[in-house]
Amino acid sequence: MTGAASQQQTETPLYGERAIDEAELICFDNPRPGRAYEVSIELPEFTCKCPFSGYPDFAVLRLIYQPGPRVVELKAIKLYVNSYRDRSISHEEVSNRIVDDLVAACDPVWLQLEADFNPRGNVHTVVRVSHGTRQPC
C-alpha cells in the first residue's frame, strides 16, 4: 500500500463507523397491539468511557420491554448502543439516557434496562432503570 493510499484509508471513515455515526433508534408498528408480551434483548458488548479517568467501561445491557404501539428494530438498537463507545458518560447517566431515548422512540408499556458493568478496581456496578408498569403476560 502506498503512503497516499494509506493516508486516504485513515481519513475515510469505514462503513461501520459511518453507520454508527448515523445511528438512530428506528421502530416499527407493533404486529400485535393490545396483546401483552415481552421482548428481551441482550447487548453483551456495550462500551463507553469513564468521564473521570477516560478509561473504557464495558457492560452487558439487558433490555426487557412490553411494546406499546411500536417495536424497536434490532439493527438500529445495535448501532445506537455502539454510538456510545467513544462518549465520556457515567454508568448512571448512560443507563437513564438509553431508557429515555427508547421511551421517546417506541413508547413501550413497560421497560427495564439492566446495565451490568464489568468490575473495575474491585467495584462491580449494576444499574437498573424502569419505565411504566409491567403487565401480566
From Swiss-Prot:
What is the protein's known function?
Catalyzes the NADPH-dependent reduction of 7-cyano-7-deazaguanine (preQ0) to 7-aminomethyl-7-deazaguanine (preQ1).
Which PANTHER family has this protein been placed in?
NADPH-DEPENDENT 7-CYANO-7-DEAZAGUANINE REDUCTASE
Which species is the source of this protein?
A: Synechococcus sp. (strain CC9902)
Q: Which residues form a coiled coil?
A: none
Give the protein's recorded name.
Answer: NADPH-dependent 7-cyano-7-deazaguanine reductase
Keyword line:
Cytoplasm, NADP, Oxidoreductase, Queuosine biosynthesis
Give the superkingdom in one word: Bacteria
State the gene name recorded for this protein: queF
Q: Does the keyword Nucleus apply?
A: no
**Database matches in HAMAP family:** QueF_type1 (MF_00818)
User: What are the subcellular locations of this protein?
Assistant: Cytoplasm
Binding positions (substrate)? 72-74, 91-92
Q: In which pathway does it act?
A: tRNA modification; tRNA-queuosine biosynthesis
Tell me the classification of the organism that encodes this protein.
Bacteria, Bacillati, Cyanobacteriota, Cyanophyceae, Synechococcales
SUPFAM superfamilies found in the cross-reference section:
Tetrahydrobiopterin biosynthesis enzymes-like
In this protein, the active site sits at 50 (thioimide intermediate), 57 (proton donor)
Keyword Translocase (UniProt): no
| Catalytically driven reaction(s) | 7-aminomethyl-7-carbaguanine + 2 NADP(+) = 7-cyano-7-deazaguanine + 2 NADPH + 3 H(+)
